[in-house]
UniProtKB/Swiss-Prot annotation:
Function of the protein: Required for rescue of stalled ribosomes mediated by trans-translation. Binds to transfer-messenger RNA (tmRNA), required for stable association of tmRNA with ribosomes. tmRNA and SmpB together mimic tRNA shape, replacing the anticodon stem-loop with SmpB. tmRNA is encoded by the ssrA gene; the 2 termini fold to resemble tRNA(Ala) and it encodes a 'tag peptide', a short internal open reading frame. During trans-translation Ala-aminoacylated tmRNA acts like a tRNA, entering the A-site of stalled ribosomes, displacing the stalled mRNA.
Keyword set, alphabetical order: Cytoplasm, RNA-binding
SUPFAM superfamilies, alphabetized: Small protein B (SmpB)
Disulfide bonds: none
Lineage start: Bacteria, Bacillati, Actinomycetota, Actinomycetes, Frankiales
GO molecular function: RNA binding
Protein name: SsrA-binding protein
Listed GO CC annotations: cytosol
Entry-linked HAMAP family: SmpB
Keyword Cytoplasm: yes
Similarity comment: Belongs to the SmpB family.
Subcellular compartments: Cytoplasm
Length: 159
């Protein structure tokens, strides 16, 4: 059987783009156990409460829920265990410097398969206040309305 190519999405954290201003994104590998891989192959995971933390020069992913594999036995994994992320040393050092500035955090954006390996996209992000969220929603709605008006104009329908 040939290896799968491309990028196949497993889970996405849509809430993160609403709650945070995304400054930079990174792709990282994950250290997983066998039953976790099988659960991910079934397309089951949740990134909603997830975050990444740096300790001892390593990046750890916390609170990402990968449910137990239904066919697993006593060797099954804990659903919310912390998982090590694989990044280049230079990327880790850059992230250490930026997260220590204050106000910045690492949040997972998406979990996907890339060439048969589980990858996670993490973002260096700054939390938004509630008024910033409302402002972003208003801007998005205005842009959508402008796009609709331009589309009607292009089709020859005014109003």
């Amino acid at each position: 059987m040939p290896r799968e190519t491309g990028r196949r999405l497993i889970a996405q954290n849509k809430r993160a783009r609403h709650d945070y201003d995304i400054l930079d994104t990174y792709e990282a590998g994950l250290v997983l156990r066998g039953t976790e891989v099988k659960a991910l192959r079934a397309g089951r995971a949740s990134l909603v409460d997830g975050f990444a933390q740096i300790s001892d020069g390593e990046i750890w992913l916390h609170n990402v829920h990968i449910p137990e594999y239904t066919e697993g036995t006593w060797t099954n994994h804990a659903p919310r265990r912390k998982r090590k992320m694989l990044l280049h040393r230079a990327e880790i050092e850059k992230l250490v410097g930026k997260t220590q500035e204050g106000g910045l955090t690492l949040v997972p954006l998406s979990l996907y398969w890339k060439d048969g390996r589980a990858k996670i996209e993490i973002a260096l992000a700054r939390g938004r206040k509630s008024y910033d969220k409302r402002h972003a929603i208003a801007e998005r709605d205005a842009a959508r309305e402008i796009g609709r008006a331009m589309g009607r104009r292009a089709k020859g329908r005014y109003l």
